[in-house]
């Protein structure tokens, strides 16, 4: 009987204790102590505080179930009124000295605070000490949240500025790409229109292929290497007569065959045995050296032969006679200065002194007729009185294929290539020499009538001398 009474008294006392605990604290304790809610809200490791792990889920599911609302800020303000404080600033962890795990009966020690103006001036000492040790949960939580929001705002502003800069750069690149695409489209349209017109034109393909061939030909001609004349060949070509061999050097022009035949016949006559006594005959004239004893100061021979002056010899055109050397000036050879391709220094007068005994009879050129009169060799050749042979002078005269003539006629430039040839001073000099030589030769052949006239005058002079 007594035991039953004690149990009833204990139940009454527990009921009285439970009735003295505020409903907010009781519901909060039951919610935290429930093991089914540990993933959202649970006790801390020290069992003297609780932690809200998932605030959105906590506000969505548990606040409506226990407190009939879903406002987490309102729940925090309720905790603040009962003296709870936020322990960790990085998470939602709240603590109170009377809120411990397994000690629900001490929740009655937690008293809800009233506003300061309403509170009596005197309060218990224990409550004062507990309030001084705690931190206002609502105030601390709001300030922390404001600071966090400000930090987030700054970060977002920086990110926004960066994104705007990237947007401007991207727009600039996009404009450039659009302009390039527009230009490419215009070029493509121009090309298509050009091709359409070209296909419609019947002579386009022929003209295009012709231009391509001309361009290739021009490139090949510009890359062609031209041979420069050898210095030794230039030196050998500059001398008209070799003093030792007395070989005759001449330029072979377009009338090469006729001139070669005439010179060979003259050489034949000079080598004939019938000309050994020409030194004493009348009307002989010189191509080489003759004895000085046969020639006087006035140009006549010692045995009364007719006068043959240097003017008569030098007036013969260079197109029919080879280059000869002389060392005395002549006053009547001005006509030859403008027509001969060689200088006056290429003529040679008769030698004097002891050279008479050493001179060969082959150096004299003359002829004898049946009546004893001396006939002019040139007139005889032109009149057909003498027969010429064309085998004597082949070794003495250079051929067209010789290197001396290749520098003049081997590679004659085309008129269209004049601009390409004038690329250096050496080439310019060679071209000018070739052009001058060609013009001189053309002038020589244009003076054929004058040469014939001079030849006739020489024949008349010879006849007059014989009459005297």
From Swiss-Prot:
InterPro entries linked to this entry: HSF_DNA-bd, WH-like_DNA-bd_sf, WH_DNA-bd_sf
Entry keywords, A to Z: Activator, Cytoplasm, DNA-binding, Nucleus, Phosphoprotein, Stress response, Transcription, Transcription regulation
Ranges spanned by the short sequence motif AHA, renumbered to the chain: 402-411
Pfam families on file: HSF_DNA-bind
DNA-binding region: 21-115
Segments carrying motif Nuclear export signal: 454-461
Keyword Cytoplasm in record: yes
One GO location term (cellular component): cytoplasm
Low complexity compositional bias, start-end: 277-305
Location relative to the cell: Cytoplasm; Nucleus
Chief location bin: cytoplasm
Motif placement: Nuclear localization signal: 223-227
Reported modifications of this chain: Exhibits temperature-dependent phosphorylation.
Recorded GO MF terms: DNA-binding transcription factor activity; sequence-specific DNA binding
Biased composition (Polar residues): 211-220
Region (Disordered): 211-244, 268-309
Sequence segments annotated as region (Hydrophobic repeat HR-A/B): 133-199
Similarity remark: Belongs to the HSF family. Class A subfamily.
Quaternary data: Homotrimer.
Domain notes: The hydrophobic-rich region (HR-A/B) corresponds to the oligomerization domain. AHA motif is a transcriptional activator element.
UniProt-listed PANTHER family: HEAT SHOCK TRANSCRIPTION FACTOR, HEAT STRESS TRANSCRIPTION FACTOR A-1E
Protein task: Transcriptional activator that specifically binds DNA sequence 5'-AGAAnnTTCT-3' known as heat shock promoter elements (HSE).
Name of this protein: Heat stress transcription factor A-1e
Native organism: Arabidopsis thaliana
Lineage: Eukaryota, Viridiplantae, Streptophyta, Embryophyta, Tracheophyta
């Amino acid at each position: 009987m007594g035991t039953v009474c004690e149990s009833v008294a204990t139940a009454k006392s527990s009921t009285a204790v439970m009735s003295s605990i505020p409903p907010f604290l009781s519901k909060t304790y039951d919610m935290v102590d429930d093991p089914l809610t540990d993933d959202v809200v649970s006790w801390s490791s020290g069992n003297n505080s609780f932690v809200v792990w998932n605030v959105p889920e906590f506000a969505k599911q548990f606040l409506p179930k226990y407190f009939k609302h879903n406002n987490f800020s309102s729940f925090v303000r309720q905790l603040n009124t009962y003296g709870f404080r936020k322990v960790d600033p990085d998470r939602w962890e709240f603590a109170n000295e009377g809120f411990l795990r397994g000690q629900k009966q001490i929740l009655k020690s937690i008293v809800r605070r009233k506003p300061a103006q309403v509170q009596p001036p005197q309060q218990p000492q224990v409550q004062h000490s507990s309030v001084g040790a705690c931190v206002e949960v609502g105030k601390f939580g709001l300030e922390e949240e404001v600071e966090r929001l400000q930090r987030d705002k700054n970060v977002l502003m920086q990110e926004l500025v960066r994104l705007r800069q990237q947007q401007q750069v991207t727009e600039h690149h996009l404009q450039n790409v659009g302009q390039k695409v527009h230009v490419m489209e215009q070029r493509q349209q121009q090309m298509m229109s050009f091709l359409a017109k070209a296909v419609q034109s019947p002579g386009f393909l022929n003209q295009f292929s012709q231009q391509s061939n001309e361009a290739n030909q021009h490139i090949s001609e510009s890359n062609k290497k031209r041979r420069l004349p050898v210095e030794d060949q230039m030196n050998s070509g500059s001398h008209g007569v070799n003093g030792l061999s007395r070989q005759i050097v001449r330029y072979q022009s377009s009338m090469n065959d006729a001139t070669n035949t005439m010179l060979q016949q003259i050489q034949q006559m000079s080598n004939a045995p019938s000309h050994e006594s020409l030194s004493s005959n009348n009307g002989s004239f010189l191509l080489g050296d003759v004895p000085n004893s046969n020639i006087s100061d006035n140009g006549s021979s010692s045995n009364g032969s007719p006068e043959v002056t240097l003017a008569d010899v030098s007036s013969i055109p260079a197109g029919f006679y080879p280059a000869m050397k002389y060392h005395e000036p002549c006053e009547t050879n001005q006509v030859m200065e403008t027509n001969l391709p060689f200088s006056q220094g290429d003529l040679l007068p008769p030698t004097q002194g002891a050279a008479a005994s050493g001179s060969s009879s082959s150096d004299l050129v003359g002829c004898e007729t049946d009546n004893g009169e001396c006939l002019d060799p040139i007139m005889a050749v032109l009149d057909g009185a003498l027969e010429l042979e064309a085998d004597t002078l082949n070794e003495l005269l250079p051929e067209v294929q010789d290197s001396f003539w290749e520098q003049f006629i081997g590679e004659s430039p085309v008129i269209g290539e004049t601009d390409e040839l004038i690329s250096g001073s050496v080439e310019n000099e060679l071209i000018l020499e070739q052009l001058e030589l060609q013009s001189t030769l053309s002038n020589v052949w244009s003076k054929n009538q004058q040469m014939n006239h001079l030849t006739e005058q020489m024949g008349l002079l010879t006849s007059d001398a014989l009459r005297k």
